[in-house]
């Protein structure tokens, strides 16, 4: 399972870079875990080059590397090229169970489903594996004659799965009578801080988008003992904010310079991020932290980004190979829709008034001020499995 977390985190960094190429001056927020899980359901039905491309983009090959080691290259290639691995499917099952383990300290809702034109009949083996490993059932629908109604039904289902936080995943033109297969993935997360911000300390302050432009934000503040890490070569400082029970944490990466985000984004790799955010790189500081209250609701049609990353055949009617899903020809992936919702406030990641507290330090720790009043990167990590649940960039209020 550790190898699957590595694959998801590698994908997180690369996908974030790809989104950033076409999101100049905009916020970014997505779930690498959510996208990987939903695409794994499609991957289960692929063969040949379609499977190999998906494996490469999603770093599923890393799972075989991790399991077999360098001395089993031939076996690894055979397993990876076939695009299938019971270990990988089982890893997704185990990882999802750990992440979705319900506790009183957080709520995590995920809506994952494949919709396929009803003229394509599923193999029984595919249906069985989907139920076993993903707890999911592909839906056969009538895109040809009722695409508008199907879109409404999809949106209604996603809304019901996310507590109506994500009610309109598919836009009006998302599907039509030529649609053969659509993948939908939506996530909603609500967590409570281990140390809440005091509402009384929240004040309006300027957020500096660049050296010449700023916008007002509601800026929260706290004085607390927090874990801090320094990235000296990129003049960036990071801080970890735990949610209750410490199963999840928010990791904030703040460049020292107002316009330092581009340099950080260009330099970041999975290996560097893993090193920077590891426990042995963190020290405890007495931190005066300023963090904006913000809400993010981001939607993506992932086809363009995934194509650019090398996953082309799955979207090509003449090349897609979904023969492990169905015996019918010409089935291809029409679109992949992904939407996330996040709200950061005094209590945590969803609205409610909280009465925060400040700490008086009996053991003197180094003191530092961290003012997130300019663009920064952030992650929400599942600490038990070291999986990046959400990946984001806050550029502008």
Swiss-Prot record:
Segments traversing the membrane: none
GO molecular function: peptidase inhibitor activity; serine-type endopeptidase inhibitor activity
Gene Ontology terms describing biological process: negative regulation of proteolysis
Keywords: Cytoplasm, Nucleus, Protease inhibitor, Serine protease inhibitor
Locations listed in the record: Nucleus; Cytoplasm
Pfam families: Serpin (PF00079)
Tissue expression from the record: Expressed in many tissues, including brain, heart, kidney, liver, lung, prostate, skin, spleen and stomach.
GO cellular component entries: cytoplasm; extracellular space; nucleus
Protein name (database record): Serpin B10
Lineage per the UniProt record: Eukaryota, Metazoa, Chordata, Craniata, Vertebrata
């Amino acid at each position: 399972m550790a190898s699957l977390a590595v694959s998801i985190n590698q994908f997180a960094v690369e996908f974030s870079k790809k989104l950033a190429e076409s999101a100049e001056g905009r916020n970014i927020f997505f779930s690498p875990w959510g996208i990987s899980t939903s695409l794994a359901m499609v991957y289960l039905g692929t063969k040949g080059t379609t499977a190999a491309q998906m494996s490469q983009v999603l770093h599923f090959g890393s799972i075989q590397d991790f399991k077999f080691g360098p001395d089993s290259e031939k076996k690894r290639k055979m397993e990876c090229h076939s695009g299938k691995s019971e270990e990988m499917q089982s890893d997704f099952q185990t990882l999802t169970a750990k992440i979705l383990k319900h506790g009183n300290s957080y709520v995590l809702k995920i809506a994952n489903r494949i919709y396929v034109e009803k003229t394509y009949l599923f193999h029984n083996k595919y249906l069985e594996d989907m139920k076993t490993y993903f707890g999911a059932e592909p839906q056969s629908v009538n895109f040809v004659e009722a695409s508008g109604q199907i879109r409404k039904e999809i949106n209604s289902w996603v809304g019901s799965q996310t507590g109506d936080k994500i009610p309109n995943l598919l836009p009006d033109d998302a599907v039509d009578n030529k649609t053969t297969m659509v993948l939908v993935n939506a996530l909603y997360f609500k967590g409570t801080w281990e140390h809440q911000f005091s509402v009384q300390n929240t004040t309006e302050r300027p957020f500096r988008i660049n050296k010449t432009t700023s916008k007002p934000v509601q800026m929260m503040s706290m004085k607390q003992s927090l874990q801090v890490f320094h990235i000296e070569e990129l003049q960036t400082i990071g801080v970890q904010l735990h949610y209750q029970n410490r199963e999840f944490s928010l990791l904030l990466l703040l460049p020292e310079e107002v316009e330092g985000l581009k340099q950080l984004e260009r330099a970041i790799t999975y290996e560097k991020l893993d090193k920077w955010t590891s426990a042995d790189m963190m020290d405890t500081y007495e931190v005066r932290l300023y963090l904006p209250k913000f809400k993010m609701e981001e939607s993506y049609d992932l086809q363009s980004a995934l194509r650019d990353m090398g996953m082309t055949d799955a979207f090509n009617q003449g090349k897609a190979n979904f023969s492990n899903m169905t015996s019918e020809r010409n089935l291809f992936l029409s679109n992949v829709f992904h939407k996330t919702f996040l709200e950061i406030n005094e209590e945590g990641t969803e609205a409610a008034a909280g009465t925060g507290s400040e700490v008086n330090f009996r053991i003197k720790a180094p003191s530092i001020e961290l003012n997130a009043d300019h663009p920064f990167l952030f992650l929400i990590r599942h600490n038990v499995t070291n999986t990046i649940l959400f990946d984001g960039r806050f550029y502008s209020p």
